[in-house]
Amino acid sequence: MEKGFKKWSKDDSKVLSRFLSEYADLPIVAHCAEYDYEKVLLKAFKDVETLEWLPPVERWRCTQILAKSKLKLPKYGLDEVLEGCGLEAREPGKPHEAEKDAECAANVYLHLNTLPDLKESELGFWNQ
């Protein structure tokens, strides 16, 4: 177990599930949502046998995937996307902070949804 992290419990699954149920009409937004879903939450819920409480994958929105349809950037990490959106980036050299990353992803999501999709001709070689 990493320093500073407590072991995920059945109670943690219950609390998160209740919270997400209260806001069931809202998406769950993350940058690299597939990683957060599969490597973090799916594993945590599975480890304590509460998989049925995990929110469905259809609720998730990935700001990295969304950014690729809206912005032409050399890289699509959270810092690059924040910069591409003209939003305040995370402080360089600071350790990863999940709460700050979640706030940044939410701001990116809201901003990207105001932008039109790139035209196919703007997508670059990877779409050909």
Describe each region flagged by the PLM.
Residues 1-3, 20-128:
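Metal-dependent phosphoesterase core characteristic of DEDDh/y 3'-5' exonuclease domains
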Residues 1-19:
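Metal-dependent phosphoesterase signature
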